[in-house]
């Protein structure tokens, strides 16, 4: 295990009816005027925005709205939000939605006090040193952005999907997590979210760092809980307890605890970002295609950890690492495909003729000649992995 620093400043309010506390939590955040950021329609039509605004009014907090966040959120709306926040003297951002909404809110929060272009933090190598405070009302269990200091935005002009990472500055000051708000999600979006949270765990699990048994076991336990609870949540969307377990697993998957003292990988996320930047596919669906392909490559290059995963979460009883790894990949692919209904190929993502050369170029332009923490991949390797998705 390596040395590490950990700071988790987010206050979590979890459970039924917790939305009604948004006013008092915003007051505690030190804000008297906020910008409410949300998606295209559901938060409005469901009455959730009305509930949030009622709670804010009850606490004498003024607010403005910015709707229209789309999956794979874009820089153009962030720029609109920054201008609005500056014009209206906004003191904080309240994100009502899932990862795309939260990431947009974080980007706006970082951009308001910055004198330059906010994209400098994503594609220009600039470090975020200050931001408006962000609060969250979560509606989708998936990205884990409600507990992380990260944000991912797509640049429409350059067709780049890039992230900004901070240890604490972009972490929400509070996150309201009411699993009942996820009940109305369509099954496909629930499945995409489950895939995403599992990928967040696996990106940290596949590490070259030795002697990390505590975080290995935490990761394995979360994966086993998700694998147990996901079928219940998919079969009965109104199963509150299944939703509660899935939602909390999503937060735990990406709040930083699982990465303590270990090198992380993140190749699969980077490869998926190239796909969704070019073709605008759902992030979770893209990961369902990418991660098994990456694992398949590892079967012949570094199978031991893949085998360990299968033995511990799927009870695979095969002594040979390579053979155990093959079975692990098959079990994971079956879970994504059969239980969650996720795609497994480019064609099933709706991409008839994927531009693999463009993906490889984009990936290595951002990440450098060699990619990955668990196993270093060159452009020939990543091209091979993309071709496994055909």
Regions found by a protein language model. Give the residues of each.
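Glycine/serine-rich anion-binding loops at beta->alpha junctions
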Residues: 89-108, 139-145, 278-281
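A glycine/threonine-rich phosphate-anchoring loop and its flanking beta-alpha core
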Residues: 20, 113-211, 308
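Short Gly/Thr/Asp-enriched flexible loops that form oxyanion-binding sites at enzyme active sites
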Residues: 51-52, 82, 101-115, 147-148
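ATP/NTP phosphate-donor binding region
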Residues: 1-92, 346
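Active-site segments that bind and position negatively charged phosphate/pyrophosphate groups
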Residues: 204, 208-331
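Short glycine/serine/threonine-rich phosphate/pyrophosphate-binding segments
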Residues: 19-22, 45-48, 75-77, 100-106, ...
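C-terminal charged capping/lid subdomain of soluble metabolic enzymes
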Residues: 306, 313-390
């Amino acid at each position: 295990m390596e040395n590490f620093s950990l700071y988790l400043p987010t206050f979590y309010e979890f459970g039924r009816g917790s939305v009604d506390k948004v006013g008092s939590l915003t007051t505690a955040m030190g804000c008297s005027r906020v910008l409410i950021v949300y998606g295209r329609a559901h938060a409005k039509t469901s009455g959730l925005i009305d509930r949030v605004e009622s709670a804010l009014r009850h606490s004498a907090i003024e607010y403005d709205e910015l709707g229209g966040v789309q999956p794979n959120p874009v820089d153009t709306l962030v720029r609109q939000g920054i201008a609005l926040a500056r014009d209206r003297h906004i003191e904080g951002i309240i994100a009502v939605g899932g990862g795309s909404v939260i990431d947009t809110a974080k980007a706006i929060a970082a951009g308001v006090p910055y004198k330059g272009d906010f994209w400098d933090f994503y594609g220009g190598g600039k470090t975020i040193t200050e931001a408006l405070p962000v609060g969250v009302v979560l509606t989708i269990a998936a990205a884990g952005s409600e507990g992380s200091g990260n944000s991912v935005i797509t640049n429409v002009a350059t067709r780049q999907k890039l992230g900004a990472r901070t240890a604490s500055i972009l972490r929400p000051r509070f996150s309201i997590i009411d699993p009942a708000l996820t009940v109305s999600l369509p099954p496909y979006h629930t499945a995409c979210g489950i895939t995403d949270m599992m990928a967040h765990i696996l990106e940290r699990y596949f590490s070259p760092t030795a002697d990390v048994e505590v975080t290995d076991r935490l990761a394995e336990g979360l994966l086993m809980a998700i694998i147990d609870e996901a079928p219940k949540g998919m079969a009965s969307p109104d199963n509150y307890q299944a939703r509660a377990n899935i939602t909390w697993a999503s937060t735990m998957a990406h709040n930083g605890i699982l990465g303590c003292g270990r090198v992380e990988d993140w190749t699969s996320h980077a490869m998926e970002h190239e796909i969704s930047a070019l073709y605008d596919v759902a992030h979770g669906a893209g990961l369902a295609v990418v991660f098994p392909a990456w694992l398949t490559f590892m079967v012949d290059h570094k199978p031991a950890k893949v085998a360990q995963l299968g033995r511990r979460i799927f009870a695979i009883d095969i002594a040979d690492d390579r053979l155990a790894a093959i079975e692990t990949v098959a079990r994971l692919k079956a879970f994504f495909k059969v239980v969650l209904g996720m795609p497994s190929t480019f064609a099933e993502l709706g991409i008839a003729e994927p531009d693999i050369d463009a993906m490889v170029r984009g990936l290595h332009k951002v990440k450098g000649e060699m990619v990955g923490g668990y196993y270093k991949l060159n452009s020939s390797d990543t091209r091979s992995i993309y071709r496994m998705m055909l």
